[in-house]
């Protein structure tokens, strides 16, 4: 098999080393917004194992104290790369601590907005950055400058809010330029990536299509076959279309009806993908197999792993059934994994812990016989939507709300049965139907109904009822890393609740989830 270049080897790349800040992913997003490719890895990344050389390195913020015994620290080999380095918040303190300066608790913690004063206008990091509002989030502070560094910026409470090495392109800032509250933060990040690191602004979806198609062809070769999971969602559809563009009929799209799909989903997917996009599609009804294995299981992590493992078994079986005309065996399994999936599943001792196994990157068998191919794993959601439109996929499909790989199984809290799935499925259908009628669908990033494992007393007619509870969720987000709940009008929620209680047998009560991410995740399980 020919060697396949990583995206970070094809495009000039800024490496973001994550120390656990809730804002770390925003650094990557901001850089990509001005067409510079950025990749985030844990701060524990060994530079010798990287396999590519970044144009520059950014050390993120984090919740630790650099002087603590259990504090995470960057691989010192990063300083041997000979590339510019920018430390943000904890990253500044890490740079100073490594250089021998004293870092300790501040007299008072500094959270929220502050006024930045640029002290060194000649510093290239602050080119076209004036005194402005910045966002602070720290309890520790630098007590003295490290040797060979000078001050570039200050705030009222931070005399070393910006520092720079006297002769090397090493910079530190105590504030967070990646958040929108820092009014000129994007300019500062662009100065670092484009002016200081000299990273080419070539990261566009047009360029990505050409690069990724070539990568797929190199990876798969001229004869191998690929089998791909599709669900009718944005991610799997874009991945399937991209694969079809790359290898044509050697790609076999498979829809597994796992018994926990949306209402009429199998028929709709067959029409849209098969007839509309010309993708060769096979529908496999494995609903009984999935539901049987889920019987009696209530733990959400176990559900995910069961669904992931069963999914792989079904695909291996289907791959064996399909006989390619050229006699080659199917070698690859396509998945529509996105970059947020990868970020959320990173787990290392210290700054970050896995919140839950992601349905696209977790729950896979160790002995999986098919090789995984994930052409979208470097992309955020908005990038995937843009890519889909460039590939000729309809606006309606490209902007369809996400649907999780485990489907309604993680929207039925508790044991998953055919009856419980049907209740959640019907409630969800009514909810989405009303959102569309109200003209709100494209204003909302994701919406769904889930069935709670509790019962509630109700009154239907003159009869007392004791039935289940539906929770509705709708969120607004740009990247699914953070999200706010959608503020529906009360009359809208009243109407939806009335329809669900009256039309879905077994439901006595409807609630609306008003929790943001963080602290909650988008899905309940």
From Swiss-Prot:
* Molecular functions per Gene Ontology: ATP binding; GMP synthase (glutamine-hydrolyzing) activity; GMP synthase activity
Q: Enumerate the catalysed reactions.
A: XMP + L-glutamine + ATP + H2O = GMP + L-glutamate + AMP + diphosphate + 2 H(+)
EC no. given is 6.3.5.2
Which parts of the sequence bind XMP? 304, 462, 517, 523
Name its GO BP terms in alphabetical order: GMP biosynthetic process
Q: Name the coiled-coil region(s).
A: none
Lineage, top ranks? Eukaryota, Fungi, Dikarya, Ascomycota, Saccharomycotina
Q: Which cofactors is this protein said to need?
A: Mg(2+)
Report whether Zinc shows up as a keyword of the record. no
Function field: Catalyzes the conversion of xanthine monophosphate (XMP) to GMP in the presence of glutamine and ATP through an adenyl-XMP intermediate.
The record's listing under InterPro entries reads: Class_I_gatase-like, GATASE, GMP_synth_C, GMP_synth_GATase, GMP_synthase, GMPS_ATP_PPase_dom, NAD/GMP_synthase, Rossmann-like_a/b/a_fold
* Database matches in Gene3D superfamilies: 3.30.300.10, 3.40.50.880, HUPs
Pfam families assigned: GATase (PF00117), GMP_synt_C (PF00958), NAD_synthase (PF02540)
State which pathway it belongs to: Purine metabolism; GMP biosynthesis; GMP from XMP (L-Gln route): step 1/1
Which of this chain's residues are annotated to bind ATP? 231-237
The alphabetical list of record keywords is: ATP-binding, Cytoplasm, Glutamine amidotransferase, GMP biosynthesis, Ligase, Magnesium, Nucleotide-binding, Purine biosynthesis
Q: Which organism is it from?
A: Eremothecium gossypii (strain ATCC 10895 / CBS 109.51 / FGSC 9923 / NRRL Y-1056)
Source organism superkingdom: Eukaryota
Domain Glutamine amidotransferase type-1: residue ranges: 13-202
**GMPS ATP-PPase domain ranges (all copies):** 203-400
- Gene that encodes the chain: GUA1
What name appears for this protein in its UniProt entry?
Answer: GMP synthase [glutamine-hydrolyzing]
